[in-house]
C-alpha cells in the first residue's frame, strides 16, 4: 500500500523528484546558526533548532511541488536525543505538507525506526529477508548500492556471473522490496533494471539523463533524490528549476 501512495504522489506532482535532507551543520547558512546561538548560546539546543528551522523551511519549499522527502537519520541522530526529536518532528511536518516521508537509515531491523512515523525505511539487505519485515502500510527499501566511498569494496564483488549488489537486488525485489541504488552511472541503472524489471527504484544522487533507463514510457518506476537543494539560497526557486530540468528527460503521465 505504501508504494502505491508514493506512486500516486509522483503522478499528482508530475515529477519523480524527492528532496533529500541530510544537513551538515558547517554547510548551513551562518545566519541561521548565529540566530539560534544568540538565542540559546553555543549549546546543543542551538544546533538542533537550527536543523529544525532549516528542515522546516525546505519542506515548505517542497510542499505542492515535490512528491516526497528523504531524511538521512544520521544527520539528526548525531545531535543526540534533541536531534531525534527534530527528526520525528520533520517527518510529522512532511506528512502535514502531503510529502511522502522516507527515513534513510539502512536498518538491519526496521522495527525500532517505524516509530518515527515515516512511510518508508531504507534497510540493509545483507541482513537477509528479516530486514523486510514491515507492516503492509509501510515500505522497505533495500539499500543494495550505497554512496559511501568504500561501498564498492564489497558491493562490486562477483557473486556468480554478476556483482554482489545486483544479486542482492534480485533477491530483495523478489520479496517485494523497493531498491535504493546510489549511483550516478546509467550503466548501473540499466543493469539493475534488467535484473529487476518491475522493482521500484530510489536513485540518490542520480540526474535525469543517467536515471533514464529506470523509467517506463509513462515516467513511472523510480524516484530521484536530490541533496543539493538543501543548501540553495532560494529553495523554492531551486525546486522549480530542478523539476523543470528533470522534465526534459522524464515526463510523468
For every predicted segment, state its role.
Residues 69-80, 100-107, 119-130, 143-145, ...:
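Catalytic beta/alpha-barrel core
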Amino acid at each position: 500500500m505504501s508504494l502505491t501512495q508514493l506512486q500516486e504522489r509522483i503522478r499528482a506532482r508530475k515529477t519523480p523528484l524527492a528532496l533529500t535532507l541530510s544537513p551538515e551543520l558547517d554547510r548551513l547558512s551562518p545566519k541561521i546558526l548565529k540566530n539560534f546561538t544568540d538565542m540559546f548560546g553555543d549549546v546543543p539546543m542551538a544546533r538542533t533548532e537550527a536543523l529544525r528551522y532549516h528542515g522546516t523551511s525546505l519542506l515548505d519549499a517542497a510542499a505542492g511541488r515535490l512528491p516526497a522527502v528523504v531524511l538521512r537519520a544520521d544527520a539528526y541522530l548525531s545531535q543526540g536525543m534533541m536531534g531525534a526529536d527534530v527528526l520525528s518532528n520533520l517527518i510529522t511536518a512532511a506528512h502535514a505538507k502531503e510529502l511522502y516521508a522516507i527515513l534513510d537509515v539502512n536498518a538491519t531491523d526496521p522495527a525500532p525506526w517505524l516509530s518515527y512515523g515515516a512511510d518508508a525505511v531504507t534497510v540493509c539487505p545483507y541482513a537477509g529477508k528479516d530486514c523486510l519485515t514491515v507492516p503492509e502500510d509501510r515500505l522497505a527499501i533495500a539499500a543494495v548500492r550505497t554512496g559511501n566511498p568504500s561501498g564498492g569494496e564489497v558491493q562490486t564483488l562477483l557473486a556468480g556471473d554478476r556483482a554482489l549488489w545486483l544479486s542482492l537486488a534480485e533477491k530483495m525485489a523478489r520479496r517485494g522490496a523497493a531498491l535504493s541504488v546510489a549511483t550516478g552511472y546509467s550503466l548501473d541503472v540499466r543493469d539493475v533494471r534488467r535484473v529487476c524489471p518491475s522493482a521500484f527504484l530510489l536513485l540518490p544522487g542520480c540526474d535525469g539523463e543517467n536515471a533514464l533507463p529506470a523509467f517506463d514510457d509513462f515516467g513511472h518506476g523510480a524516484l530521484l533524490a536530490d541533496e543539493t537543494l538543501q543548501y540553495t539560497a532560494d529553495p523554492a526557486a531551486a525546486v522549480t528549476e530542478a523539476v523543470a530540468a528533470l522534465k526534459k528527460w522524464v515526463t510523468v503521465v
